[in-house]
């Protein structure tokens, strides 16, 4: 398998595109773990049987993107 080739069709089957507003509605400050004091905290929430995974910093970032450019 060549890891340099990104297969968008496979990605679409594995991932869901969610707007920032939808994430804000699902995960607000009342959600356990959403207000972590860690600079980057991984939060996993199950919504109707689907696991939604995101990385938090000062704002929502894609999982694994807890970087300087994502946090600020």
UniProtKB/Swiss-Prot annotation:
Q: What is this protein called?
A: Lantibiotic Flvbeta.g
Task: Extract one GO cellular component term from the record.
Answer: extracellular region
Which residues get removed as pro-piece? 1-34
Which domain of life, per UniProt? Answer: Bacteria
Q: Which UniProt keywords apply?
A: Antibiotic, Antimicrobial, Bacteriocin, Lantibiotic, Secreted, Thioether bond
Please give the residue positions where the record annotates the modification 2,3-didehydrobutyrine: 37, 46, 48
Q: Where is this cross-link: Beta-methyllanthionine (Thr-Cys)?
A: 55-61, 63-66, 67-70
Where does it primarily localize?
secreted
Cross-link Lanthionine (Ser-Cys) per UniProt, renumbered positions: 36-40
Q: Where in the cell is it found?
A: Secreted
PTM field: Contains LL-lanthionine and DL-beta-methyllanthionine, when coepressed in E.coli with the flavecin synthetase FlvM2.
What GO molecular-function term can you cite, just one? signaling receptor binding
Function, as annotated: Lanthionine-containing peptide antibiotic (lantibiotic) that is probably weakly active on Gram-positive bacteria, since its analog [Del1]Flvbeta.g shows weak antibacterial activity against M.luteus. This activity is synergistically enhanced by [Del2]Flvalpha.a, an analog of Flvalpha.a, which is encoded by the same operon than Flvbeta.g. The bactericidal activity of lantibiotics is based on depolarization of energized bacterial cytoplasmic membranes, initiated by the formation of aqueous transmembrane pores.
Q: What's a BP term from Gene Ontology annotated to this protein? A: defense response to bacterium
């Amino acid at each position: 398998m060549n890891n340099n080739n990104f297969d968008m069709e496979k990605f679409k089957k594995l991932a869901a595109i969610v707007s920032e507003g939808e994430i804000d509605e699902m995960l607000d400050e009342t959600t356990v773990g959403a207000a972590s004091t860690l600079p980057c905290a991984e939060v996993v929430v199950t919504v109707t049987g689907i696991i939604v995974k995101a990385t938090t910093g000062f704002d929502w970032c894609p999982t694994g993107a807890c970087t300087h450019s994502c946090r600020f």
